[in-house]
Amino acid sequence: MEVPSEAPSGEHPDVEPSPHPRPARANAGGIASHRRARRLRRLAGLAVLMAPTLWVVTTDFLRRGRLLLAFDRPHALGYLGSVVESLIFWSVLLHVAARRRGGFSAGVAALFLLLFTLAMGIEGAFHAFYNIYLSMDGQVHSKSIPWSIVGTLPFSRPIVLAHVLGAFVLGAGLLVLARRFVRPSLWPRRITPLLVPFALYAVIRIPVSYRTLQSTPFDMIYFHGVAAVTREHLGITHDSPDLRVQRREPDDVPAMTARPARPRNVLLVLQESQRADVSCIDYEPDCKLATRFTNKLLPGRFPLRQLRSNASTTAISISNIWSGVRPTERRDTLHSVPLLWDYARAAGYDTAYWTSQNLMFGNARLYVQDIPVSHRCVATDLDSQSDLDTGASDSLVSDRVIEEWGELKEPFFAVVHYSNVHFPYVYDEEFAPFQPADMDKSAEKNEEFKNYYRNVVYLSDMAVGRMLSYIRDTDAGKRTVVVYTSDHGESFREHWQLGHTSSVYDEEIHVPGWVDAPPGTLAPEEEESLRAARDELVWHLDLAPTFLDLLGLWDDPGLRPFRDHMMGHPLTRRERTTEPVPLTNCTWLWECAFRNWGMMQGPLKLEAREWDNEYHCFNVLDDPDELHNLGEQACAPLPDLARSTFHVMPNITPPGRPHTDWGKK
């Protein structure tokens, strides 16, 4: 019996050797190729996990690289730290979402796509619209969490839709790539799902730089803002206890036909916090007050020496000016009435709005976000790091108007809205003729502080004067009627308070006003009416009717339904507003932290503040400093009308509002 020989080492005795054995070198090459493929797949997987944060950093540099490179060391380190936070957050979500099986993985994948689309799409669209990222400032005042999540942006605008859809497609693509290239090994596959809740918690709790510098990647700023508005709605925080501006939904304005008394353009120049008594309202050859530049430029203007705002709060005041509607109207009315731009556009006018105001303040952007304009800029367009209170430099908005003025098509209606006279004020020692001046709010330094304010008005007026000088030298400027006023005034302890929004005393509501019209832009009867208005008591509620008359729309049948809500009268016509006029800093457009309101009829003014349980009565012509209270009965029937209009005295705590002992604070 033959015994089979022993098989060579490494070969099975029952398997016949291949007639074409694989060379050892070929086997080694296959293994190396396989290892290279695995390394490349791992590198590709790592790149996919890093891609969301790389997208954030890259697009951020494309939008504002110069500003990022200018960060000082602490802010640069803060930015880098937030980049690491972003990297961990997106990597954890995408790592878990890369698994092809399991309900948890599918849920995290959906969450990743949702958060990626919102953070990248909404922030990209918001920056394209406002030159700044959406932050807590632009979200916390929203009364709707869903709208705050999408930045209350106008999705009818192609630029908004493009950013959001682009982010969705990119996020979906990253999920596909993750499931192809990210192959978690056993332990990472078990551990990363446990990190998801910690990652989500971290991005809503770790502080961010969300104002001015925004030295945090925008995805982290976005999640911080969403968390802030959610906590506000849940009552965990009270950063926005009072109602602020919400998005308007204006009624449709029918097509109208403009029939102005003379062919003309109309321009409103709106100042901020400027008192009447620091302004040369009449032309004065040797003006000693703060508005020397505009005074010298327009000697033939029609002064309005007794013009008063109906509020000393900007948001309420601009509503009064631009809508003509009483500030005491219902909330739905205040958010649905058209504004001057809506009427002008319905009549075929070109329209513009330029402002140095930072409209991130108190949701103010929502009031003008949807106005129909061909030219528009806000503070963050001019300077993305503009101050929330003082805005961008008034000089910058004048530059923008000068740059774009020639692009407007006549006839047009435009508004230039300044900002730097708002506290804490924009001051330049090189342009400060009022001395001694000191930024010191202590009582013993009150006059120096007021001089500081005068110098601020002087500097801002320089920017206004430069803009108007340019406009008057253009062909279109020679056909443009200019109306000038301020949203409200500013108090300096005349009645124990500083600033504005705190009362309806004259230091806060008596404002400068004038109309300047080149030859041939007004009819003789319009000139006569404006000349007669010099010393007559007129109101901001008269300005919207005045603009509509200048635009040739006041008598249009299409305007009649909207005129029913307007109580004012055109200053270009002889009829004046003689009925009682509401004055208030508390409305359904903008609630007040310090309650105050009143009424006026002719020279008689009724006012009350947070601590008052009865009204005070003054005659502002006989007693311009409002030092002698005449008693409620001297203003009859205004006290009864005020109680009917405002329902309670300011010292009554409204239901649902925490009681505050104002006598001790």
Show which residues each predicted segment covers.
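Active-site-proximal alpha/beta segments of enzymes that process anionic O-linked groups
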Residues: L200-L268, S273-D440, L551, G568
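Substrate-binding rim/cap in mid-to-C-terminal beta-strand-loop elements of soluble/periplasmic
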Residues: L304, A311-W322, K441, G499-R576
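C-terminal cap/loop subdomain of S1 sulfatases and analogous C-terminal strand-loop tails that border
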Residues: E490-E494, D549-H616, V620
